[in-house]
Design a protein with these regions (language model features):
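N-terminal lobe of the biotin/lipoate ligase/transferase fold
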Residues: 1-143, 163-170, 318-321
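Long, positively charged amphipathic alpha-helical accessory segments at protein N-termini or as interdomain linkers
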Residues: 2-10, 28-36, 123, 127, ...
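Short, basic and Ser/Thr-rich N-terminal targeting/leader segments
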Residues: 54, 81-83, 151-153, 276, ...
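Short beta-strand
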Residues: 60, 149-152
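Residue-level recognition of hydrophobic positions within alpha-helical transmembrane segments
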Residues: 64-66, 152, 229
Length: 321
């Protein structure tokens, strides 16, 4: 039985679950781990809302199933969220990734945010949205933590393993963040979901290929600082992209994404939805953001993010050729 509390009284220890969420549904804010400290909502709004910042809507909520699911629902009834609307949560318990993957984290241990943008460029250029978002997140993580963050096409962020060890199918890097881009009803707005593992310990991580900023060796991590940097970098890159009509070459963004993309230059295998595997060397990104693989016979095949389930390295600590 859950005991009722008087307003203003702290939750008894037995009313707080191991995931940091109290039995009344709120997030426990008594953590002694600075990396799990609550987001400073007033500071976030002051820095990000216009006219100071790039956003028109910004809300920090305590708990939600999925920030993207919630933002998509809000877009159906309130168009004010449509361009420059940000929803971030202290804790989400039904986060979503590509191919229906579920992403859950302990309360206060991650950054979970969704940003609504109106691309305003030809639809065939929207394939760059997750890549540009990933570049922005990578730059934010580098500047705030010093970790060497890079992109794994099409939507993951990698950092070197703290101990330098390798994991099959991933090599000597670990996934620290992921991105999910979804088109909202009406087809004119895209919701960019961003999840960053911040403070999880190795024991709290779901798979050996995952890490967090703290587990990867970052010290003095502050979630509010990382959040502000992520939004600033992502919105700045998207503004450049839109200013050039979505032409990444004209904006110089194709070269910047390529320089940060760990996938390029390596031998990889791509698994298609029907289970078919395509192998080759990842040689470049084409005009719409597709990954171009060159086979042993010299032929090339572009792969669109929506047509691929997994991309894995081939070779040492990767798949066997």
């Amino acid at each position: 039985m859950v005991r009722k509390r008087q307003p203003g009284h702290a939750a008894p220890a037995e009313d707080v679950r191991d995931d940091g969420v109290r039995d009344d549904g709120a997030v426990d804010r008594t953590t002694q781990d600075p990396a799990r400290a609550p987001l400073r909502a007033d500071e976030v709004r002051a820095a990000l809302l216009a006219p100071v910042g790039p956003l028109h809507r910004c809300e920090v909520v305590d708990r939600v199933g999925s920030t993207s699911t919630e933002l998509l629902a809000r877009l159906r009834t309130d168009p004010g969220w449509a361009d420059g609307g940000l929803l971030t949560a202290e804790h989400q318990d039904a986060g979503r990734g590509r191919a229906g993957h579920v992403w859950t984290t302990p309360a206060g241990a991650a950054l979970t945010l969704s940003l609504a943008v109106r691309p305003g460029v030809p639809r065939e250029r929207w394939g760059w949205l997750p890549l540009l978002t990933g570049l922005g997140v990578a730059r934010a993580l580098r500047s705030t933590t010093g970790l060497d963050a890079g992109l794994k096409w099409p939507n993951d962020l990698l950092v070197p393993a703290a101990d330098g060890t390798g994991v099959p199918d991933w090599g000597r890097e670990r996934k620290v963040a992921g991105i999910l881009a979804e088109v909202a009803p009406g087809g004119e707005v895209v919701v960019l979901g961003i999840g960053v593992n911040v403070a999880q310990t190795p024991a709290e991580l779901p798979v050996p290929s995952a890490t967090s900023l703290v587990a990867a060796g970052a010290t003095g991590v502050d979630r509010t600082t990382v959040l502000l940097a992520v939004v600033a970098e992502v919105t700045g890159l998207l503004a450049r992209w839109r200013a050039h009509g979505g032409d990444v070459a004209a904006a110089g963004l194709d070269a910047e994404v390529a320089a940060a993309c760990r996938t390029l230059g390596g031998a990889v295998r791509a698994t298609l939805p029907d289970g078919t595997e395509v192998r080759g060397t990842a040689v470049r990104l084409d005009a719409d953001g597709a990954l171009v693989l060159r086979a042993a016979d010299g032929s090339e095949q572009p792969l669109l993010a929506g047509d691929v389930r997994h991309v894995r390295p081939v070779g040492e600590l990767g798949s066997q050729v």
